[in-house]
């Protein structure tokens, strides 16, 4: 059976370098690879199906090219994968264009936003036959065998006789080792490693990809939908399976990989085993992770650095304990400072801090405290983004109860908190304080961490011509 998989992107979250094509002729993209559809492609191919992937970041495959390929090759199923509410409008447009030119092909939506809003999505976008909820590997294998009658396919939302039907949820799969490595070679794109800065900066020109070694995060941060999507559970692949994929990547020419786990630092024994496996296999591939500052695995930072972990990114959010508590981060400023310093002392090359501004109940003094706090941390890079609220997060539910958002009419939207929450500072104040704070922060870094700042600028400037 022939299946098409399309990764739908919000144009804000990727960029094309000035030199768009690599020497091998493949298009280069500054952004993360679509690991979701790559994983599904590998599963489908192992089961004997044919699979073709498209990524909307590729300028060679705009919507009309994808639609022409669908009409010419007549796949049995076209799956559109998208991450969040920001890419949902683009998925709707493509689905309606596909349906306008082909009344027979089966269409499916998948991804976090689709999973959390399945019935509403099906009602708003009737052109789509199936909305798939949760993990997709076994779901898509079951679905392709029952396209005409998905009654028995757990995790699917569909319609019959004009009525939306929500099949029971799938049992969350804990054995992640059973799935093959993602199909990274069939999509003719090369991804450029870049930092998540307001102005994306190229980090290296090594062949780059992403991996997922675990799924989920059990912490209750009010702005995050991950605990709801993963039912508050954390699931992980075995160290042996992770090291085997790293070895596979190095053998195929990859020099750098970023783990897109929501919280890599959760299980120290597993981390230790992964580092030992990398050392025993004598791998040289570099890798990066995200994690919480209160992780008990910080004593393993030296082992991670020895195993070529180059980047650690922390969700710091604020330099005000009041705001951290308001966001239910369950971390302290002391833990932030300890984690960042431990990572740098261990030899982690790049330590990044994610911060939010425009938070509920945040004052100008809180914002200034955040920039002052950031200036004293030995961070290599940092980002300060306006806090947004999405359906599926605890903060959204709070705003529904407070009458700030309408569940019936706003479910597919997202808002900057400062646009709707009267306890937030006005947007113009946030932008002014942020601009002033960044100026002070950069000056502080230059004078107090000159070597660190010089090394970072040298790294970025080295690759600026490709942008």
Segments (PLM) and residue ranges:
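C-terminal accessory regions of radical SAM enzymes
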Residues: 2-22, 157-160, 164-166, 350, ...
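N-terminal [4Fe-4S]-dependent radical SAM core
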Residues: 9-19, 24, 159-210
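Short, solvent-exposed turn/loop segments enriched in Gly/Ser/Thr/Pro and often Arg
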Residues: 57, 260-267, 292-293, 356-361, ...
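Catalytic cores of alpha/beta
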Residues: 118-124, 300, 361-375
């Amino acid at each position: 059976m022939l299946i098409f998989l399309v990764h739908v992107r919000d144009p804000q979250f990727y960029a094309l370098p000035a030199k768009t094509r690599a020497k091998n002729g493949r298009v280069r993209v500054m952004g993360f690879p679509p690991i979701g559809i790559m994983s599904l492609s590998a599963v489908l191919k192992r089961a004997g199906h044919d699979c073709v992937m498209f990524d909307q970041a590729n300028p060679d495959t705009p919507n009309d090219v994808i639609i022409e390929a669908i009409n010419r090759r007549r796949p049995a199923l076209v799956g559109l994968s998208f991450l969040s509410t920001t890419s949902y409008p683009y998925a709707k447009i493509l689905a309606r264009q596909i349906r306008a030119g082909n009344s027979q092909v089966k269409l499916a939506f998948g991804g976090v936003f689709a999973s959390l809003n399945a019935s509403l999505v099906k009602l708003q976008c009737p052109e789509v036959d199936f909305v798939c909820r949760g993990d997709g590997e076994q779901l898509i294998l079951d679905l392709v065998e029952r396209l005409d009658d998905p009654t028995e396919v757990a995790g699917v939302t569909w319609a019959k006789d004009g009525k939306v039907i929500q099949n029971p949820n799938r049992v969350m799969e804990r054995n992640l080792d059973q799935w093959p490595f993602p199909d990274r070679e069939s999509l003719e794109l090369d991804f450029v490693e870049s930092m998540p800065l307001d102005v994306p900066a190229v980090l290296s020109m090594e062949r780059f990809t992403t991996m997922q070694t675990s799924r989920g995060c059990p912490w209750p941060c009010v702005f995050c939908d991950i605990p709801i999507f993963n039912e508050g559970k954390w699931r992980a692949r075995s160290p042996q399976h992770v090291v085997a994929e790293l070895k596979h990547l190095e053998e195929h020419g990859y020099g750098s990989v970023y783990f897109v786990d929501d919280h890599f630092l959760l299980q120290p024994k597993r981390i230790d085993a992964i580092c030992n496996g990398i050392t025993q296999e004598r791998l040289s591939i570099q890798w990066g992770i995200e994690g919480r500052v209160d992780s008990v695995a910080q004593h393993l930072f030296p082992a991670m650095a020895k195993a070529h972990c180059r980047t650690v990114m922390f969700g710091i959010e604020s330099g005000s304990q009041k705001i951290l508590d308001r966001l239910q981060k369950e971390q302290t400023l002391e833990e932030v400072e300890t984690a960042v310093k431990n990572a740098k002392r261990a030899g982690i090359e790049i330590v990044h801090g994610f911060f939010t501004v425009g938070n509920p109940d945040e004052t100008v003094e809180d914002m200034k405290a955040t920039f002052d706090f950031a200036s004293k941390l030995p961070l290599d890079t940092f980002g300060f983004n306006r806090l947004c609220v999405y359906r599926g997060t605890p903060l959204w539910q709070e705003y529904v109860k407070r009458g700030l958002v309408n569940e019936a009419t706003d479910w597919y939207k997202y808002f900057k908190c400062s646009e709707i929450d009267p306890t937030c500072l006005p947007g113009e104040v946030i932008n002014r304080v942020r601009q002033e704070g960044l100026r002070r922060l950069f000056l502080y870094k230059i004078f107090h961490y000159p070597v660190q700042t010089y090394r970072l600028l040298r790294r970025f400037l080295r690759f600026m011509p490709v942008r």
